[in-house]
């Protein structure tokens, strides 16, 4: 599962609450904008939650280190692309990057994490 977390307002707590609300409905199938049907639903949600956790931890570590946002976003996108190539192959990785702009997911998570530390 590869979520999209672009700025300005990704909110991981609201995502988690939404996932739980949908789980309560016990759907057999999800129809995802741009991605089609997803089943089994629980596996999809577990993958989504895991990806949010892994991605936010990566961004949090980068924010605690040195380097510019651009450097961090580029490194995040490169690592994500490597993950996609490993799991899906080169051609799917190219299509994924063309449709998602994974660097923007870094910026969305970075903004979210910075706002959380300001609260």
Identify the role of each PLM range:
Residues 58-119:
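C-terminal regulatory/interaction regions
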Residues 6, 24, 28-31, 35, ...:
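Alpha-helical context
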């Amino acid at each position: 599962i590869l979520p999209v977390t672009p700025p300005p307002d990704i909110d991981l707590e609201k995502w988690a609450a939404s996932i739980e609300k949908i789980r309560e409905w016990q759907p057999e199938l999800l129809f995802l904008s741009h991605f089609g049907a997803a089943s089994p639903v629980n596996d999809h949600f577990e993958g989504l939650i895991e990806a949010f956790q892994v991605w936010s931890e990566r961004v949090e570590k980068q924010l605690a280190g040195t380097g510019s946002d651009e450097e961090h976003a580029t490194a995040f996108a490169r690592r994500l692309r490597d993950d996609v190539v490993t799991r899906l192959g080169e051609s799917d990785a190219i299509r994924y990057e063309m449709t998602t702009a994974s660097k923007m997911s870094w910026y969305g998570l970075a903004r979210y994490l910075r706002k959380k530390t300001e609260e």
